[in-house]
């Protein structure tokens, strides 16, 4: 059997059964952990969209983003960029770090904010206020509503239900459906594996489902694409 077909089958077999038989559109998210990526092969393996890490906190940039970002577009993938949020770093400084690396074009997906770790001690009230500020700053800068990425146990222990205006990207593995996350009635994107195998990526990679078609996903993107 041709190698490309084998890899495409491996990707399909690693996905959970569709939740309630809904339409799900496959994507991946990457960072420097994945090393060099052959995005043309990723696209050929049946991946429709992808996110690449751009920045972390108020100073760190991902060293692979400058290569990944144009290559994703050249390969024909619907692309997005994400920021690894650092609790305790000033929201305005985190915005400056992300915008230094990311210029969005029409058709690009909205920024995703990865909220999964409490790096510095901070009271719950201040932590919630800072995240609201950062998300509002992102929305004002790019003109699209950012996506919140998190995992149920961390979010439910540290945040409240006041973020439901933002689409939810939930991470939970080895289950038929992710647990509820405080504030949301359902998820928009589900990261269902952190150990996927995809042609063009030489290391395990995060696999994601968007709940809907690719055209539905593009409705979240920067207008004009």
Tell where the protein language model's regions lie, with residue ranges.
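Positively charged n-region of N-terminal signal peptides that target proteins for export
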Residues: 1-5
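Bacterial N-terminal signal peptides
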Residues: 7-16
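Substrate-binding cleft of extracellular glycoside hydrolase catalytic domains
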Residues: 22-40, 52-144
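Functionally critical loop-and-helix segments that line ligand-binding/catalytic clefts
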Residues: 22-32, 163-225
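Sec/Tat-exported extracytoplasmic proteins
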Residues: 46, 54, 73-76, 102-106, ...
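Structural detector of well-ordered beta-strand residues that form the stable sheet scaffold
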Residues: 80-82, 112, 147-149, 169, ...
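Aromatic-lined carbohydrate-recognition surfaces of secreted/lumenal glycan-active proteins
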Residues: 143-155
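Beta-rich nucleic-acid/ligand-interaction surfaces
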Residues: 153-163
């Amino acid at each position: 059997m041709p190698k490309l077909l084998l890899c495409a089958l491996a990707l399909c077999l690693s996905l959970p059964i569709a939740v309630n038989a809904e339409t799900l559109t496959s994507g991946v998210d990457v960072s420097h952990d994945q090393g060099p990526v052959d995005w043309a092969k990723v696209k050929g393996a049946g991946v429709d969209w992808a996110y690449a890490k751009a920045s972390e906190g108020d100073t760190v940039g991902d060293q692979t983003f400058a290569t990944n970002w144009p290559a994703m577009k050249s390969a024909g993938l619907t692309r997005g960029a994400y920021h690894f949020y650092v609790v305790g770093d000033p929201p305005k400084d985190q915005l400056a770090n992300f915008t230094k690396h990311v210029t969005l074009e029409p058709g690009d997906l909205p920024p995703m904010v990865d909220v999964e770790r409490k790096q510095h001690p901070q009271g719950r009230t201040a932590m919630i206020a800072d995240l609201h500020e950062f998300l509002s700053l992102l929305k004002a800068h790019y003109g699209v509503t950012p996506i919140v990425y998190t995992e149920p146990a961390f979010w439910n222990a540290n945040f409240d239900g006041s973020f439901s205006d933002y689409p939810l990207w939930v991470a939970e593995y080895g289950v038929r459906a992710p647990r509820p996350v405080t504030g949301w009635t359902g998820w928009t994107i589900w990261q269902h594996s952190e150990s996927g195998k995809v042609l063009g990526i030489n290391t395990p990679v995060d696999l994601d489902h968007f709940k809907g078609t690719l055209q539905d996903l593009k409705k979240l993107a920067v207008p004009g694409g």
